[in-house]
């Protein structure tokens, strides 16, 4: 079905479903990558003196794409409040240590990923999200040059 577009506002509205889906796909990629590195973090060290809660492993969250003031937005984040039951340490501190490759503030394993930094390196910094966006737009019939 053809849409009549008379101005830039009409064009922006017509493009919103495509942009929303593209942003949701990009957020999914970041979320999957974050969960991959969260799992690698847990796999890198097996605690001897305590039993794991697994709250940090399940602390990654994704908010589906939506249109806000004419723009498609989505969120992927580590929920610090989700880790509120750690003894004597905040969720913020747990996430900070994990991003420094530390377990409980200590360097206990040589192969511990820096969870958030490696997520960004493998999605944003390496251009994967841009490639995914271009591929999606092309699949929708857009001509895209990078």
Feature-to-residue mapping (PLM):
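Short, Lys/Arg-rich flexible segments
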Residues: 1-77, 95-146
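Short, surface-exposed beta-strand/loop "edge" segments at domain boundaries and coil↔beta transitions
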Residues: 71, 80-92
């Amino acid at each position: 079905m053809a849409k009549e577009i008379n101005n830039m506002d009409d064009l922006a509205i017509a493009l919103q479903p495509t942009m929303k889906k593209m942003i949701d796909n990009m957020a999914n990629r970041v979320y999957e990558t974050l969960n991959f590195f969260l799992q690698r973090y847990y796999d890198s060290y097996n605690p001897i003196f305590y039993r794991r809660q697994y709250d940090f492993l399940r602390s990654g969250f994704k908010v589906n794409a939506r249109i806000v003031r004419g723009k498609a937005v989505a969120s992927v984040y580590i929920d610090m409040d989700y880790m509120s039951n750690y003894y004597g340490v905040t969720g913020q501190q747990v996430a900070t240590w994990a991003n420094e490759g530390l377990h409980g503030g200590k360097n206990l394993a040589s192969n511990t990923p820096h969870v958030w930094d490696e997520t960004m390196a493998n999605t944003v910094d390496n251009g994967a999200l841009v490639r995914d966006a271009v591929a999606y737009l092309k699949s929708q019939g857009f001509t895209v040059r990078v």
